[in-house]
């Protein structure tokens, strides 16, 4: 009887091992499937995107993805790209293929900064927004960032003419008044939850415009930093990405 019992045990063990093996294979297949699902898809100039040099990715209030490139504007609906380029025979189109930055205003219109102007997309028509310097003279300048502020204004960051503002219903863009008017070469800005404006100059120096307009030029702990980017989390903490000192909190 003992040999028979041993055979039953061996068969039982084989069934158990087979079951475990099948279970492990099933888990492996699920894991592999999840890994495949998480794998990114590359879009470049050989695959739908108009240029390999992309400067910003922006998602609008309807969920569409807008991509600024050095060869036109790309719009992605989750399935396909639509590319908009400068049309020399179309006065209502892009006036440049050199798109630097994107945001959306209070009315839901897309706002673009190019290498020489500020544009607003009204339906299918691009409108050029006149940019006026501190003497109210028209200028053409390199727009490096567009950002919607808490009051609905669009802050327009330029290289050479400082920070400008475009009010929702205004037909032009004007130099931001106050102490910040003396700042000309701006790299990046961030308006925090307290409505203070953090300003990174092109040389990496960090400044802050208080809500009352006062400009703070010495921010403790940042004097020696070469700041490249700035972000704020949901708790209000400010993070600085620096050139040689890592991330500063």
Predicted regions and their residues:
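Carboxylate-rich, polar loop motifs that coordinate divalent cations or form catalytic acidic clusters
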Residues: 1-249
């Amino acid at each position: 009887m003992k040999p028979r019992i041993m055979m039953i045990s061996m068969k039982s063990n084989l069934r158990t091992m087979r079951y475990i093996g099948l279970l492990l294979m099933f888990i492996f297949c699920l894991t592999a499937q999840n890994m495949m699902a998480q794998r990114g898809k590359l879009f470049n100039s050989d695959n739908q995107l108009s240029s390999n040099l992309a400067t910003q990715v922006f998602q609008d209030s309807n969920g569409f993805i807008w991509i600024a490139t050095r060869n036109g504007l790309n719009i992605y609906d989750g399935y396909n790209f639509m590319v908009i380029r400068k049309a020399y025979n179309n006065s209502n189109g892009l006036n440049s293929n050199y798109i630097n930055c994107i945001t959306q205003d209070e009315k839901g219109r897309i706002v673009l900064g190019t290498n020489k102007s500020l544009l607003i997309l009204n339906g299918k028509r691009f409108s050029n927004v006149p940019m006026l310097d501190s003497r109210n003279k028209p200028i053409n300048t390199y727009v490096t960032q567009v950002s919607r502020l808490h009051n609905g204004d669009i802050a327009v960051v330029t290289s050479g003419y400082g920070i400008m503002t475009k009010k929702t219903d205004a037909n032009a863009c004007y130099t931001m008044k106050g102490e910040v008017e003396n700042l000309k070469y701006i790299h990046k800005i961030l308006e925090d939850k307290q409505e203070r404006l953090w300003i990174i100059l092109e040389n990496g120096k960090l400044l802050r415009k208080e809500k009352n307009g006062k400009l703070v030029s010495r921010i403790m702990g940042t004097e020696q930093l070469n700041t490249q980017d700035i972000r704020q989390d949901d708790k209000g903490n400010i993070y600085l990405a620096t050139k040689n000192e890592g991330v500063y909190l």
